[in-house]
Amino acid sequence: MVNKAVCVLKGTGEVTGTVYFNQEGEKKPVKVTGEITGLTPGKHGFHVHAFGDNTNGCISAGPHFNPHDKTHGGPTDSVRHVGDLGNVTADASGVAKIEIEDAMLTLSGQHSIIGRTMVIHEKEDDLGKGGNEESLKTGNAGGRLACGVIGITQ
């Protein structure tokens, strides 16, 4: 079983980061840690997208990873995309420290996030509560600032 992964985030602007994934066992939650720099202060949507394709920048990563065909939600909602990790918050200097534990993510099996793309978005994710169609798809999180493919590590 794969139990560690990493993702290096890069975009067309100043936003960069490194995100680590650790899963102690098959039925255990995935711990997501890391740091993203170059952000505007405040909340930014943070999602795993369906494809590991960054040939056309972050746009070719496709929609949020959603193998169960659910609507968009927050990380604590029972109805959500597997890739819905909510928001990360950048401080006044534009740095977001990531510390998330998520029971829906997995690093192995049919719905593994390995080979998919992690994306940091321009705006705050409304967690599917924005009252419009786009909210139920993307959380109205806006453009894709930086992304990277999630890969196996030691």
UniProtKB/Swiss-Prot annotation:
GO terms for cellular component: cytosol; mitochondrion; nucleus; peroxisome. Its EC number is 1.15.1.1. Its cofactor is Cu cation; Zn(2+). Transmembrane segments: none annotated. Binds 1 copper ion per subunit. Binds 1 zinc ion per subunit. A lipid is attached at C7 (S-palmitoyl cysteine). One of its GO terms (biological process) is response to metal ion. Zn(2+) binds at H64, H72, H81, D84. It holds the Pfam family Sod_Cu. Its main location: cytoplasm. GO terms for molecular function: copper ion binding; superoxide dismutase activity. It catalyses: 2 superoxide + 2 H(+) = H2O2 + O2. SUPFAM superfamilies: Cu,Zn superoxide dismutase-like. It is found in: Cytoplasm; Nucleus. Keywords: Antioxidant, Copper, Cytoplasm, Disulfide bond, Lipoprotein, Metal-binding, Nucleus, Oxidoreductase, Palmitate, Zinc. Disulfide bonds join C58-C147. Cu cation binds at H47, H49, H64, H121. Belongs to the Cu-Zn superoxide dismutase family. Homodimer. Destroys radicals which are normally produced within the cells and which are toxic to biological systems. This is Superoxide dismutase [Cu-Zn]. The gene is sod1.
